[in-house]
Amino acid sequence: MRDRSKRSLVAAVVVILVVAAGVVWWRADREPSHTAQEPQRHQVHLGDSFASGAGTEPLVDGAQFTCQQSSVNFGQLVAARHDYRLTDVSCAGAWTKSLYEGQYEGVGPQLDAVTPDTDLVTLMLGGNDATLYSTLIGVCARVEPSDQKGAPCRAELGRAPTRAVDDAIEPAVEQALRDIAVRAPRARIVVAGYPWLVPREQSCRPSVRIADGDIAFVRGVQARLNSAIEKAADATGARFVDMAQRSDGHDACAADDVRWIEPMTGTTARVTMHPNEAGQRALADAVDEALGS
């Protein structure tokens, strides 16, 4: 009788151990497989409305509305393609100073998102500094009726835009890239240049209200800006993505199915003279190439 009790006790212990082992095995087998599916690398996406994808829907759920973060901006696309865990703090209207100070209520400094565990930083920034973009497009559109075949915008602005690029924007972007590198010493930093807004030569009024002679002026300012960003990248070890050659022929004057920039009129886009979804995909493709080289 005593032996039978002992055997029963041993059998019960064995059953308990087997069940417990099964629980341990089940957890060990399943939990790591769940963890393995989580993106391990961390990407931070910074920048202005060109980076946030302003005007291109759908917007990111839960993001600050004023920042106009599109779920198909190039940072979002790169993260999805490469399985990065993304922190997107890009925001419409951002200057380089927006890396260091809050831009809107509830929107902190973008640089706060960059941490030592960051593996990749993608950004496009500088075009808003010194009100470069808004002044250039705003003034050129305002004065266009006064001399449609001439260059009234160049006559009014003169060298002010290029001086702003040289004196303010280039050093600001360079410092920003240095500060990003300090915060994320192991990260790859990829900064994109701005795609062309207008064609090489004649304008396309009324879609783009810029005088014929000012087309070259606007392109010249853009070229100077992109050159400044490239120099800043070279000086800091960041990777510059040149969109000039890629975007040639995809400007706001191109056909609907070709353009990457939405024109001032004749479009359903909520934000004009900015990249559309095709433009954001082209930016993501260019960043992909940079990451692969």
Model-derived regions: residue spans:
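Secretory targeting and sorting signals
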Residues: 1-27
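Short amphipathic alpha-helices and their capping/turn segments at secondary-structure boundaries
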Residues: 27-44, 103-122, 173-188, 288-291
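Serine-esterase "nucleophile elbow" of acetyl-processing enzymes
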Residues: 29-92, 111, 140-146
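Structural recognition of the beta-strand scaffold that forms the well-ordered cores
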Residues: 42-45, 51, 86-90, 119-124, ...
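Oxyanion-hole/transition-state-stabilizing segment in secreted/luminal serine hydrolases
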Residues: 54, 104-165
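Charged, often glycine-rich, active-site loop that binds/positions anionic groups
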Residues: 94-111, 253-267
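Conserved N-terminal glycine/acidic-rich loop preference
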Residues: 120-123, 146-181, 190, 194-240
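Catalytic His-Asp segment of secreted/periplasmic serine-dependent ester chemistry enzymes
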Residues: 195-293
